[in-house]
Amino acid sequence: MFSSRHILSNVRPIIKNLDLTRGFSDRKTKYFDLNDLIKTVNVTYKTGVNLEETTTVESKYVDVTPSSNTKGTVVTLSGSPGTHNDFKYMKSFFEQKKIRLICTNYPGSEFVTGGLHNSYTNQDRNSYMKSLMETLELKNVNRLIIMGHSRGGENALQLTSMLSNDENWPLVGAVMINSPGFAPHKGISKRMGTINFIISLIKRHNKTINSILHPILHYFYNNLIGLRVSHGKVAAAAILPMQTFAFDEQKLSIDDLRAKPGIRAFYGYGSKDFLIDEHQSEEVAMYFSEEDHYVISNKQDAEKAIKEARKSFTTGKQFVTANFKEEGHFLQKTYPEFIVEVVDSIFDADKEVDTKI
């Protein structure tokens, strides 16, 4: 084991070379967010290898509820790092469709107090989200879709698979946006050794190490990767789930959904995603289904594709996938209306089934 002194002697030169002040601007710009809509709730959930421990956190979330005639409810799961604000561009479109939007945050984000060191495996994350959804009494809504972006995508898939085994959950679908593939992607594959080393430092919970490590991680995420984080502590928490991806195990969840015709799913990705290679995303899309796959290069393509996707869902197809050729890692920002239309079409398809019954 390395001593703290040995670690610090190797980390300090990195700080010196990085010039942590470079790239930050003193000029503040207006930032559109959903923070004025935040609500707070305490969430108690199971954690640990065998879920034998209990953790309680204070969790902030956003709940945008139509005044009447709610068509359905969609719960969003952010990436790592990520927050409820990752889905802010969808708000107005969901409101127009009378769809209730609940944007959640995971332990480790700036909007959850507690659970930092024991809530980063998929088992922990799914346990937390299930408990949060129970606390918000989402078993009582009419229709429910779980939507995840990036790291949250595989959690959306797993949760939908898991909770749909219980008929008390009104689940009708899952939406995955820029979600990881079945193997380590370029965002982590070339850095896995470094990631594992950094995680070993984070897990020491050493104040001296953290005082040096957190500024480095804050700079790394904001200036080199381009993922916005508020603090080095948040950046450190965001790295922990990088070690616990499901990857190939996602196939088990997809296979499970395939056996549940009442559950529909959409998987969308961008060819120019700077974290995930196109061929890896395409592999996931084709595993869902080689049919009902759309290649979208512009807004006109998107308009045609959403009409066809809606038709596919309403005629009984389970899975729809789309490759946005000119887009990157944030489809919920560049094509928010398209994704909202997908959610709306899944709700409509389920409504038609109910009407026929």
From Swiss-Prot:
Keywords: Hydrolase. PROSITE patterns: LIPASE_SER (PS00120). The keyword Electron transport does not apply. GO terms for molecular function: hydrolase activity. InterPro entries: AB_hydrolase_fold (IPR029058), DUF1057 (IPR010463). SUPFAM superfamilies: alpha/beta-Hydrolases. It comes from the Eukaryota. It comes from Caenorhabditis elegans. PANTHER family: PROTEIN CBG08091, PROTEIN CBG21859. This is Uncharacterized protein F35H12.5. It holds the Pfam family DUF1057.
